[in-house]
Amino acid sequence: KVALFKRTENVIQNNLTHSAEEIAKFERVSDQLEMRQALIEDWMKEEGYQLSDLEAVVGRGGLLRSMPGGTYEVTSKMKEDLIAAHRGEHASNLGGLIADKIAEKAGIGVYNIKNESSLKNLIELLK
């Protein structure tokens, strides 16, 4: 799932899908990072957006250590944990990693949220 927000308004969203054949090419979930990042960037371009249009990037989820719901800056430790997948291999582990790669290319901040209520809280903070 991807979405672009302008402050608190969800401007556009999509559910990008991948075939079983595409996914089967990868041994680990983290190996899918570049493929999924490229799909998101291609989708943005198709919709008329560039990385320079972004002010921040937010990923969602990941099987991380126990922590309260909320918004967290993506750190090197968080990235290490998401790649190592100590808590399990899951596509949600890619949320913070993809956000980090896109933010790095755009030269902007990157964050990860734990759940849907964290997203709602983040939107409220932006109002």
Annotate each PLM feature.
Residues 1-31:
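Short glycine-rich, Thr/Ser-proximal phosphate-binding strand/loop in the N-terminal lobe
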Residues 15-18, 37-40, 81-85:
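Glycine-rich loops and low-complexity Gly/Arg-rich segments
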Residues 35-47:
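Short, well-ordered amphipathic alpha-helical segments that serve as non-catalytic structural scaffolds
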Residues 6-11, 52-53, 108:
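A generic structural motif
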